[in-house]
Each structure stands twice: as C-alpha cells, then as structure tokens.
C-alpha cells in the first residue's frame, strides 16, 4: 500500500511539474509560445537569442507534452512584438512573419491607431526577429493573451428579435380572440335555438308528449352535428403523467408508481428523477430516446471508461457524482489546483454535464447514460485563460482520460469567426496522435446555440475541426430546436431541451452550506446538454471495444445514426449509404446500435490525405451572380497518397468582403453532394472576409474523391464588394490496405473483406483447389463481417495513428478477444488443425522441397528478402539526405518536426509551393493539420526561402543541401 501511495505521489508530481505555478504579469511582460526545431533544448535557444537586440527572453516552461513547444517571456519595453498581444494572433516565423504584418499595414493604421512610422518600425523589428530567430531554430511563434471561453448557454434575444416575437404573439392572441368570439356567437345562437325549441315543446307537450320528446332528442343531435362540422379536427394528445408540475420538483410516490408501469421492470433503477429522464427511456413518445436501457440489462454501463468534462468545474462531492469521480484526470486550470470544485453559484454547468454522462445509480436524482463510467473535471471556463493553458487542459492526463466533453467555444452571436491558436491546434494533434496509448482521445464538441441568430458551426474553429465529433441538439419531438446551429461539420444530433422539455439530473451542492441536502436540477438544455449525452454513448461503445481509435468512433457515430424527419428536403444521399442533413448531421445517436456495431467493428486503416494546389481566382463576385471555381482530383493524384475513400473535406479560402455575413459558399462533390460551407449570417457585418479559413465538411464521407470539386461563392448584398482570392481543397481519408497498395488497381471491392489474402500468400481460389476438402479453409473463416457495416468496410488493420510506426502492427485484431460469443482467433485454430491432420506423418520445421504445395513459400521468402533489402538501401539514402537537410539553420527542415503541417512551411502554412502540392499519405511520418492556412503567391517582404520546409522534388533537395553547406562554411569562418 505504501509503495502505491509513493508511486501515486511521484506520478502526480510529474503531472504537476508540467503546469505553470506562478501568476503571469501581462501588464509588464509579453508571453509567447514557441515551437523549436526537433531536439533543440529551450535553454540553448534562450542563450542563443539573449545576445540579440530583441529583448531579454526567459524560458518559462514546456507546454505539457506537446513536442518541442515552450513558453518564453520578455519585458514589454524591450520586446519588438509587445503590441501584437492586443491584435490578431501571430502564429508563424521562418520567413513569413513580417510578410503577414505587411498585409495588415492598413488595418494596423486604422483599427489600432498606429502611425505609418510606427508600422514601419514594427515591420523592421519583426523582419530582424524573424530572420534571427528562425536561423537559431524557431519554428513558430504565437503571442499569448488571456481570453474568455464561452459556455454553450442559451443566447439572449436582441431587442429586435423580442419585438418580432411580441408581434408574433400579438397576432396569435388576435387570432385566438377571433376564434373565441366566433365560438361565443355560435354558443349564443345555439342557446336561442334551444329556447325556441323548449317553448315549442312546452306548447305541444300535452298533445304529443312522446313525439315531442323524440323530436327534442333528434333536434339536440342535429345541433351537436352542426357544432362538429364547424369545429377544428381533434389533434392526437400524447399521454403525460403530469402537466405543469412535471418539472416542478421531485415526484410523490403515487406519480412514481404510475410512471413505473411504463418503465422496464428489469432495469431496477429507483433514482427518483429517472421518471423525468425521458431521453433515456421515453414513455410519452416511443422511440424518442437514446435506446439505452437494453444495454443496461446487458451490463453495458460504461465500466472502465473515463470522460473528462472540460468546463467550469465539477462538484465531486455531489452525491450523484462522488462514487464516479476520477481525481487523477481532474485539474483546475483557472486557479491552478487539483480540486476543480466550483467556487461560485454560477459554475453549475460542468457538474450538470458530468451528471448526464456518469451520474451514479444510487437513488439520488437521476442516472447517467454510462452510470458505471468515471468522470473527471477540468476547469477552464471560470475566468479568462491563455491559449497555452487551454492546450494543457485538453492534453491533461490524456492516457487516463479517454473522452473530452467540451460544451463551449466562441460566442454564439452570429458575428464571431474564431479558431483556436496554434498551440491549441498542436495540443489537439498531440491528443489524437498520442492519447489513450496511441489510439487517440475522442473530442466531443457542442455545435453551438446561435441558431436563432443565424449562426453556423463552420465559423467555430473547434467544431469545424476534423478531430472533433460535432454534436447538435434534438428536441422531445425529434425536431430541430431553434438554438441548435446547422453546418456541414455536424456529425450527429442527440436530445436536449425543446418542446417544453429539458435535461434533468445532477446539480452542484450549496456552495456555502455543506450540510444541505443533495440538489437536483430540472432545466438543463442547449447543445451544452447534447454533447455530454453523446459522450456518454461513446463511453458505452469504448467499454465494449477499448481498442477503438478516434477515427473509428467517428465511423461508428456516422454508420449507427438514425435518420429522423425523413421528409425534410434537406436530406441528401451520400456515398456512405447514410443520408446527410446540415441540421441533423447523419441522424440521431442510438446507443444500442452504436454498441452493437462496435462489437463487430474492424478497425479502419491509417489516415491519409490529398492536398491540391492553391487555386488563384482573384475575381469579383457580383450581386446575385454566383462565381464558380473547380478543382479536379484525378485517380493518379489519389494513388500517390495511397488513398482509398474520403472522410473529412476542407476547403481553405481567402476571400475579401465588405459585409461578410452576406456571403454564401457551397462545395459540390463529384457525387453531387452539396456542402454549405458558409451560411448567410445577418449580424456578421465584418469587413475582414475569410483569412485562410478552413471550412470542414463530413457530408462527403466514403466518397472516392476522384472528379470535379466545384466551389460556388454567392454575394447577396447589392452594395457589397466580394472577391474570391484563392482556395485549396484538402481531402482526408482512409488508406488502402497493404494488399491494395502492392497490387494497385487489381483488387476488387469484394476482396477487401478477405483477410486471408495477405502479401505473399496464394489467392483463395488457388488455395481451395490444392486444399480440397480440408477443414482449415482460412479464406472462408475470415469472411464474416457485420451486416450493418458499409459494404466496402476494410478488414482489421493496425490501430489508427496519423503516423505509421512498427510497433502498431501487432495490434491489428484486438476485437476478437473482446467478444466471447464469437470464435477464437483463426490463426491458433488453423495451427491446431494442421497439426492434427499431420499427426501420423513426420513433423518437420521445414516443408518438403518436393512438395508443390510449399514451393510458393520459398519464392515468397525471396521476394520479401529482396523487398527488405531495397527498403534498407532506400532508408540509408533517405537518412543521408535528411541529415544534410537538417543542417540548415535558417528554419527547421521537414524532418525536424514530429507534426509537419503542410510541407510548404513549418507551422502556419502560409506559403504553398505549386510544385509540392500532391501531399503525403499516412505512410509518411507526418500529419497534416486541418486548420491549415494557405497564402497567395506574392513575394512582398519575403525574407528567405530557406525558412521553408524542404520539398520532395530533387532539384529543391540539391539546392537546400548546397545552401546548408555554404552556411556551415560561413559559420566556421565566423567562429574561426
């Protein structure tokens, strides 16, 4: 026990050592996040730049586990970049730093009141810093500043919107009053008629009493029929246990007993708020829920999975959270302490979200979707926070935290267009590459609550990322809530507030009164509530298949989604076989379906990507005259990067506009699927246009990628000036498997489902001819695939990493051991069969040379040996060239960084070289950054070409090597 305690302290101290421990003085110092050349010690860099005329820079600390990324600071009065902190982020060096600033000359003068002389001084200082620091190993530079990150809370209505709503309400009241007046008039007529009938009855009563009675009854029936003809047809009424009091408090025993009649008895859960949790099991409207109770009956409850709720804190002492709280994965980054407990009554958001995921089954409030999973709290929303601290937060304990649930982002005001800083991007890349022991963390982001403002989640750099699963909201009636944002990045939707129903469950305890009873809440909502429900569903899937990668989870979410409101015109057929809608993504999450699909899922192949040349357009977009531009992708382009099928598409745009909200951008793929990349936003009056903005879409999933990709830009403002400067197409997808890679163009779709055809083995048909009726027919054994998976789903491959590493290979069939109901792994069975078949004969390690059956083995061995020899020679040559390139001191080379963004520069992707556009596949040791930016091809204020990455073309390699040799000679002369 003591050893475990000491080990825990050591691990905790190591984690804490990566956190900043002192308050920053932003008033007197400038703080920057630097990425340095691979292997360069930050102390060495600090010493090398201290003697330069750029201020006294001090190394502060590394940024978590992000490779080669560090925080430095300097006094503001000596730092040439002091006033960048209050302006647009500066994210690049290596020859393009000053160029970006030069493009902002007019903006700097007008927006920030800088004189022309001050701008010139700034540019000169930046030019010198850019050249000097890049020469000493700087890869990128980002000036850090504190900012507020916004919860996905309901958006307040504007005065204009309130007036509009009042007008709608007034008209509705007038219509209701008119209907009531009509009803009153009809009632008066009915009363008069009845009075006359009664008088007539009374006069004839003695003569025809019996007949009068019958006549009176018939007249009454006629009156009722007349009323029915005028009345509106009755609408079906849904059964509800209660009305106004439905969300007013805890139910009494009688109501609870009534509800129990409609709830599965086998579940056996008695948490008092369970009857309100309609999204877990809806007795009001069958099927309008997560379909999760059947999984609970199978004991699929999230055991072994940890979800980190990145939010405004977590009340770990709440009765519904305490037993499932995971302290090791928790930290308060706002106040730099291990306890993320809220300190304000306003910080309830994270606790409510955590309860949706993992509220304990304990007769308190309700239960979470995955009520046996663990939940951690990472606090970042309670006050302003710098970008590097945010990066630390989303990387915190990424080997222990599996899922990060994020219900926050830029303001949902229909005006903001914001993306995370470079250091945050790098943290996300680090998490999906190295988190969960290399399988990648799963990021779940709420789409946003700005729907009523016309906001769109493609203008949010978090939801617009290929690394995120973007989740929108669905209301009680399976409708689209007014607040939930639509966009082409929406993957799925799930339930939240709407139609007078809410998400209920856990709440924070009283802040000041520790003796208070546990508190439950009845009105959680927005996309803030949808994302945690999705995270809980993903926790269930990971509990049955912990080997799933971050990309596998996206596949599972897509292929298990249930289409809703199928008659809506917004649905489009896609290559995936699933239909897509910008409001609903691929449909609503179904917990049972995603778990069932996960249990038989074969891991996808590694990621690859194709990146087109930057297409320069430089054309004005006239009012109501759409501008079209086409980029054509050929089969040869895709074969070069070992491309099989598409997953995410990004289009990186540079566009100028006098009224950004009046611009609409569409992307039409080869199969005719249309992604609305940029929607109209009435409140977005910005004149900044799009500055290297990467719009992302999941609507083209499973597309082959080959063909014309047509971009359409529309200008809907009659007086507006719009110009499309340039754009670039990026297609991310799955690699072909090994067999297809070696026999390119020969494999048929059906061959992809056969695991027996490994490299060097015989074809199944030849093997069957020779084996005859033997029991060990490997091809037949391995053909079984889940029926609900896409028809071209690949076979098991090494676990997904953006980079290929030899150690990944043995983990290519982890799913078998997780499924006791299935057969054991085929290979051991085959070995036992073959040994039993040959028990009567002489057993030898070597096959009989005279046997035709084994002759192919020797040929295969020779081929493999030759292949290894060729690879070895190639590796030696490549290593020698890489070493020569790494000697360049003007900027880090392509081989210097673990994560190469676009190989035309080190980090910010501002320059794109036309001759280096057919980018690399996942086989290479680089990962493309989907936040990538492109730059027009002008050369103003360009400092040095050596600051860019080495190209793949031979002439460029020779040039870089010669220049590196020359610099080394110059350096020796200076030192001598």
Curated annotation (Swiss-Prot):
The chain crosses the membrane at residues 524-544, 855-875. The keyword Phosphoprotein does not apply. CDD domains: Peptidases_S8_Protein_convertases_Kexins_Furin-like (cd04059). GO terms for cellular component: Golgi membrane; trans-Golgi network. Keywords: Calcium, Glycoprotein, Hydrolase, Membrane, Protease, Serine protease, Signal, Transmembrane, Transmembrane helix, Zymogen. One of its GO terms (biological process) is protein processing. Its EC number is 3.4.21.-. Disulfide bonds: none annotated. Glycans are attached at residues 156, 291, 299, 336, 606, 886. It is found in: Membrane. Residues 213-231 have a biased composition (Acidic residues). Residues 172-212, 734-830, 915-928, 940-976 have a biased composition (Basic and acidic residues). Belongs to the peptidase S8 family. Furin subfamily. This is Dibasic-processing endoprotease. The gene is XPR6.
